[in-house]
């Protein structure tokens, strides 16, 4: 498994970021390739994802550790992905958002397409960074 960690500082209080993070139906606004998210009972979500010209549905289980400011998730089928988003208050009006993603490069390429090797790692890093920047914009603008 490969691991990627990225963070961004957002200019809103931690509770606002936490609430935005849990409005999964808004993910298509800031997560590239996510076309639709449907939340289900029991902490499950179905994501319709478009990658490399193909549309695919992924199912994920999501769990919270609100007291610690952590939301964790993992896919329940292929490709095997897992990650977390941790929130840390910088002060009363700013929050650090730390994203962690663990993935199998071969499984990602097989399921979603895209480049191999370092090119794949760089593409995923750019994608996560871009998604965090879009999340920041959405949260700070109250969208």
Annotate each PLM feature.
Residues 1-9, 47, 123, 129, ...:
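Hydrophobic-ligand-binding modules of eukaryotic lipid transfer/binding families
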Residues 1-44, 134-137:
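Hydrophobic ligand-binding cavity/cleft-lining segments
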Residues 3-5, 55-59, 80-84, 96:
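Short, surface-exposed coil-to-beta transition loops
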Residues 39-46, 65-73, 141:
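Short, hydrophobic/aromatic-rich segments at coil-to-beta transitions
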Residues 40, 63-65, 86-90:
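Short beta-strand micro-motifs enriched in acidic
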Residues 47-49, 89:
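Flexible glycine-/small-residue-rich
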Residues 58-66, 71-77, 83:
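Helix-adjacent hinge/juxtasegments
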Residues 74-130, 137:
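Beta-strand/loop substructures that line and gate deep hydrophobic ligand-binding cavities in soluble
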């Amino acid at each position: 498994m490969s691991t990627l960690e990225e963070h961004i500082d957002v200019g809103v209080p931690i509770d606002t970021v936490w609430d935005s993070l849990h409005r999964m139906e808004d993910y298509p606004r800031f997560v590239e390739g996510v076309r639709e998210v449907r939340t289900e009972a029991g902490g499950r979500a179905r994501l319709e994802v478009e990658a490399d010209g193909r549309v695919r549905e992924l199912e994920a289980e999501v769990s919270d550790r609100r007291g610690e400011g952590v939301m964790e998730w993992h896919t329940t089928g292929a490709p095997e992905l897992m990650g977390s988003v941790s929130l840390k208050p910088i002060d009363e009006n700013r929050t650090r958002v730390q994203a962690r993603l663990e993935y199998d490069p071969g499984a990602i390429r097989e399921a979603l397409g895209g480049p191999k090797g370092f090119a794949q790692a760089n593409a995923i890093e750019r994608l996560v960074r871009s998604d965090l920047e879009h999340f920041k914009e959405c949260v700070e603008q109250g969208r």
